[in-house]
Design a protein with these regions (language model features):
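Leucine-rich tandem repeat or coiled-coil scaffolds
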Residues: 2-266
Length: 266
């Protein structure tokens, strides 16, 4: 027997029936399989009425865990983080949280779980309201230990320049093995771009960086181009800057394409 996807949805009462009073919803997230070596994608979506400490997480046999459009309390996040750290075999390698509100404490707990040793190589947090302080706490926790994380996405979290600078500190000097970093749609302007450009100069691991739909202007664009031309981000093949209205200098963009083309990117 196997459960590929686990979904929880709220159910409306029938006509004439009183709405149920849900005080606690205990969830057991389990992927069962008849083959010990097999893995499954596990999904929880659109769950409601979840309260502190009410989630039980069993992540064994889940290669990818996706949580979308739901509320997680700090107790839920703590239990989830503990499950990530405590997983001994056939553990998740990818975690995606989409439209799952995380405050700074939730971000810190996830970061600590990663720093304390998990099998995760990919972390995607999109539309989670991680914000500046949450980003700082997440990357500080990641920076304490060299994790296995190779892909990090913080798209659409409003992290701003301070959050961009926090990520820059994470990638500066190859303190991680990150190969893909995405910070799209985060209100990052020239200040954040300058910090990222400086970090790129000494980084040899990153292959792609996504800075689309931000507020980077001519100053930030020039700094990024100069960093790449100077040999920074020596493994970099893709630097996405579309959707930055003030970063449209054709000559600078042509220089960036030329520098990336020399590496086989673009």
């Amino acid at each position: 027997m196997s459960w590929k996807d686990v979904s929880v949805r709220s159910v409306a009462p029938r006509a004439g029936m009183a709405a149920p009073r849900l005080r606690y919803l205990r969830l057991v997230v389990v992927c069962l399989t008849s083959r010990a070596s097999a893995t499954r994608d596990c999904t929880l979506a659109e769950a409601t009425d979840v309260h502190d400490g009410s989630l039980l997480w069993d992540l064994k046999n889940c290669s990818r865990v996706t949580l979308a459009r739901r509320y997680l309390s700090q107790g839920d996040i703590a239990a989830f983080a503990d499950a990530l750290v405590g997983c001994a075999e056939l553990c998740p390698t990818a975690l995606e949280l989409h439209t799952v509100p995380l405050d700074y404490e939730g971000s810190r707990l996830l970061g600590l779980a990663l720093a304390n040793g998990t099998a995760l190589t990919s972390l995607s947090l999109t539309w989670n309201a991680v914000n500046v302080e949450g980003t700082r706490r997440l990357v500080e926790a990641l920076g304490r230990n060299r994790t296995a994380l190779t892909s990090l996405s913080l798209d659409s979290n409003g992290i701003g320049d301070a959050g961009g600078a926090a990520v820059a500190r994470l990638i500066d000097g190859n303190s991680t093995v990150l190969r893909h970093a995405s910070l799209a749609a985060n209100f990052i302007s020239d200040e954040g771009a300058l910090a990222l450009a400086s970090a790129l100069r000494d980084n040899t691991a990153l292959v792609s960086v996504d800075l689309r739909h931000n507020r980077i202007g001519a100053v930030g664009l020039a700094a990024l181009v100069e960093a790449v031309e100077a040999g920074g981000g020596s493994s970099l093949e893709r630097l996405a800057l579309e959707g930055n209205p003030d970063a449209g200098d054709a000559a600078l963009l042509a220089r960036l394409r030329a520098a990336l083309d020399q590496r086989g990117g673009g």
